[in-house]
Amino acid sequence: MKAKKWLLFLAFGLVLSVLAACSGDKTKEPAGTKTNDTAEEKVLKFLNPEAIPSMDPSLATDESSFIYLAATMEGLYRLDEKTQPSPGIATSHKVSTDGLTWTFTLREDAKWTNGDPVTAHDFVFAWQRAVDPATKSEYGPYMMSGVIKNAEAINKGEAAADQLGVKAEGDFTLVVELENPTPYFETLTTFGTFFPLNKKFVEEKGNSFATSSENLLANGPYVISNWSSTSDSWELVKNKDYWDAKTVKMDKLTFKVVKDPQTALNLYEEGTVDRMDLTSDLVDQYSTNDDYTISADTFVYFLKFNQTKSEALANKNIRAALSRAFDKDALVGEILNNGSIAANGLIPKDFTPIPGSGEDFRKVSGDLVKYDLKAAKEFWAKGLAEIGTDSVELEFLADDDQTTKNLVQYVANQLSTNLEGLKVTIKQVPKKQRLALDSAMDYQLQLSRWGPDFLDPFTFMNLWTTDSGNNWTGYSSATYDKLVRDTVSTLATDAKARYNNFLEAEKLLFEDAAIAPVYQSSRAQLVSPRIQGVFVNPFGATYEYKWADVNK
């Protein structure tokens, strides 16, 4: 079925009420102007697409969690408005000549919201906890293995947590030993997994830690209020005990979970909220509105194939067929319609340049998996013959928001139509549940995504190594593992050689049809002119709220 016909089907079957209710009047007063602040209080109001899955820095794995962790906590450094590390709990650091020892000097005026000082011991505890296998952290091993000395051995149970290469020399000096020189380590320290934790508080709370506002401590710009693990609304309130509280202009930021696009639009137009994401069916109506903006990002969406849950998906030719059997250009142009672009590789466009030439990595690596129906059918026929069947049934797991619903229905229809004998059943669940099913490897086909945690291809490529804490697919390649691991070991100081390995590894990943790239996302939004100082990061926490202010 052609994309336009499928889109029309979706429009009539799924969002007819949205289209009927939207006027798209371009002459209206800009939305958001009706949200009035008192002279005593500055407030901005936002929507969130889902509940916050986790406020535990060791257990968080998703975009929403890291956004709110970054707002309420602070690590050694924080990304500024130019996406450069700026002083956080650390005021400065020194690096040894061999690049293996980093010594951080911490400020002495940083406090937790219970009045305790933030010390080097808090970082030692948090980092040890993140790699301790008893914690069952996904991100701890992913972010620290191969970077901090002994992190990998600890996570494998081959060394005790106190052998991690991090120690406190007094209360305000933190010394970190690395496995290999890591030039981007300063940037890593801005990420949520590296945030400190107050050991006494965490241990007192036990299993209740990070399950509600009352079971959290903050050391960052804001304190989260009126939140629990099942909340559909919460607030970020200015943390008056934050060491840099004078810089924080906002008194409060409010957030509400709204999944229905028409409800979100109504809230924006009546001035109840100051920002909302537009779904594809609304973009054309509002693209000339003064508040309309396209916010490009570096998230890449892909199909994950669980090779352990399906005989068909264990077959490389079947996976290769699925990867090529849906029209990605039509998907981004007509189903998403928000500035997103088709992804034909893993590393996003305009993310990182090749050392020496300065060319964009994506351009040099090229299109590795394009829509190719002829090739898809050939791979499909070969795969079916190899597994001895003429039909395959797959369950397609995805989040339950409206945009994702439109997307997965389109992809499922394309796959079922283009590959004879294939039946795809869609299973949509809340994001928190999808993440749990993902880590339990309780799925067959899944729409997933990844946003970079730091500015290096390793943040994407390490996902698919055999022992990665995020590789819940069953994919394993010793050749791929070595290519990626060498970039942080034997080739750590040879920039050109590292990137050659990344190029070769990305090519191998798609020759093996480990995953199927779908698109690199953008956000089409309506943003009130009231908002200023809210920065969008290309890696790490998507939104930075420390410098938020109201434009009167």
Explain the meaning of each model-derived region.
Residues 525-552:
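Long beta-strand-rich cores associated with HINT superfamily self-processing modules
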Residues 178-248, 252, 262:
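Gly/Pro-rich hinge or "lid" segments in bacterial periplasmic/extracellular proteins
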Residues 239-285:
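Ligand-site clamp/hinge motif
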Residues 229-231, 373, 377-452, 523:
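Ligand/substrate-recognition segments at binding pockets and active sites
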Residues 368-369, 421-434, 461-528, 552:
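Extracytoplasmic/peripheral linker and loop segments enriched in polar/acidic and small residues
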Residues 342-382, 403-405:
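Structural transition elements
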Residues 138-200:
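Surface-exposed binding/hinge segments that line
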Residues 47-97, 217:
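N-terminal lobe/hinge region of extracytoplasmic solute-binding protein
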